From Swiss-Prot:
PTM field: Sumoylated.
Organism: Homo sapiens (Human)
PANTHER family in the cross-refs: STAGA COMPLEX 65 SUBUNIT GAMMA
In-chain residues carrying the UniProt-annotated modification Phosphoserine: S108, S323, S334
Name this protein carries in UniProt: STAGA complex 65 subunit gamma
Keywords: Isopeptide bond, Nucleus, Phosphoprotein, Transcription, Transcription regulation, Ubl conjugation
Tissue note: Expressed at high levels in adenocarcinomas and gliomas and low in esophageal cancers and malignant hematological disease. Also expressed at high level in the thymus, low in peripheral blood mononuclear cells, and lowest in the stomach, small intestine, and skeletal muscle.
Length: 414
């Protein structure tokens, strides 16, 4: 029996048994994977190096510790924001579910061994110039040959360096395509730098001179870096100073979080320190009997010890910083403290006054009176105008005409 055939129908072989249309369909339907168009990169045609390094790297410990501090500060800011939100809800009276207690302040990342103080360990200063001895084998070009890195190793190191730079700049995460693109940019920059350096060295060998002190200085100016000292400034400001700044920020954030978590402790620390105040008594200078006899006879002498030494003029319980004197050197330099015994003749108007004092002439002082400053005269503890020595009317300092009268009569020295 001949069956009617249609156009395009596949003939059935005699060896193939009759099967239904369901048997002809595939048993498992597979989804077609949709791929994004590949990003065009200069290094796309080269084999992609693995992420793991096949060579040991020596990262800068200062940079790595700065990155750890940045991550630590980010965690502290998140904890502070969470604690402040909980305190604000409690202040507003909003009923919230029982939340977990705030965790304790996380510890700061420890300093590396080469950044410890000098008394702990001798630090290895980064960028330390080694093998600078002209007599060394390294300086003469002798010793082990220089290790040559393959393209894959250089690519791995450059990839890791770019990731470190981004982390040091404050980025928390980055796409792999971004890292690959920035690695290509850094690769092209290094190629440009090395080509200019090769050209400058050949030009110096051909002409025998260079317009710059060194070919490296010339290439630095050509690529836009500037002087070689710019690298030192960058290291000082962007690496070392930035590390010190992050240490300070970490300390401030830790203290702030402790004040939020333990407000009672912060209140106790904020209490003012009470200082015990001791009463200050006036110091009187006793007048010797010989001085009283001289005053009674009409002759006055001003011994060196009348005003007293500095240790006698101030009580023992007062500190030197509380003294109104500027310093001991200024006290000793004043002509009043170095007077020798001066015998004075009484004035005609004061002959009858036994307690009156004579007047010192201008020839008594080797230096003019204008050279004395008010800082050289000790003031009273209660900021009064009277003398520091005594508040009585019989005080030599209070009524002596040395401080309130001009010279009227010429004296003679003993």
């Amino acid at each position: 029996m001949n069956l009617q055939r249609y156009w395009g129908e596949i003939p059935i072989s005699s060896s193939q048994t009759n099967r239904s249309s369901f048997d002809l369909l595939p048993r498992e339907f597979r989804l077609v994977e949709v791929h994004d168009p590949p990003l065009h990169q200069p290094s796309a045609n080269k084999p992609k190096p693995p992420t793991m390094l096949d060579i040991p790297s020596e990262p800068c410990s200062l940079t790595i510790h700065t990155i750890q501090l940045i991550q630590h500060n980010r965690r502290l800011r998140n904890l502070i924001a969470t604690a402040q939100a909980q305190n604000q809800q409690q202040t507003e009276g909003v009923k919230t579910e029982e939340s977990e207690p705030l965790p304790s302040c996380p510890g700061s990342p420890p300093l590396p061994d080469d950044l410890l103080p000098l008394d702990c360990k001798n630090p290895n200063a980064p960028f330390q110039i080694r093998h600078s001895d002209p007599e060394s084998d390294f300086y003469r070009g002798k010793g082990e040959p220089v290790t040559e890195l393959s393209w894959h190793s250089c690519r791995q190191l450059l990839y890791q360096a770019v990731a470190t730079i981004l982390a040091h700049a404050g980025f928390d995460c980055a796409n792999e395509s971004v890292l690959e693109t920035l690695t290509d940019v850094a690769h092209e920059y290094c190629l440009k730098f090395t080509k200019l350096l090769r050209f400058a060295v050949d030009r110096e060998a051909r002409l025998g001179q260079t317009p710059f002190p060194d070919v490296m200085e010339q290439v630095f100016h050509e690529v836009g870096i500037g002087s070689v000292l710019s690298l030192q400034k960058f290291w000082q400001h962007r690496i070392k100073d930035y590390h010190s700044y992050m240490l300070q920020i970490s300390k401030q954030l830790s203290e702030e979080y402790e004040r939020i978590v333990n407000p009672e402790k912060a209140t106790e620390d904020a209490k003012p320190v009470k200082i015990k105040e001791e009463p200050v008594s006036d110091i009187t200078f006793p007048v010797s009997e010989e001085l009283e006899a001289d005053l009674a006879s009409g002759d006055q002498s001003l011994p060196m010890g009348v005003l007293g030494a500095q240790s006698e003029r101030f009580p023992s319980n007062l500190e030197v910083e509380a003294s109104p004197q500027a310093s001991s050197a200024e006290v000793n330099a004043s002509p009043l403290w170095n007077l020798a015994h001066v015998k004075m003749e009484p004035q005609e108007s004061e002959e009858g006054n036994v307690s009156g004092h004579g007047v010192l002439g201008s020839d008594v002082f080797e230096e003019p009176m204008s050279g004395m400053s008010e800082a050289g005269i000790p003031q009273s503890p209660d900021d009064s105008d009277s003398s520091y020595g005594s508040h009585s009317t019989d005080s030599l300092m209070g009524s002596s005409p040395v401080f309130n009268q001009r010279c009227k009569k010429r004296m003679r020295k003993i």
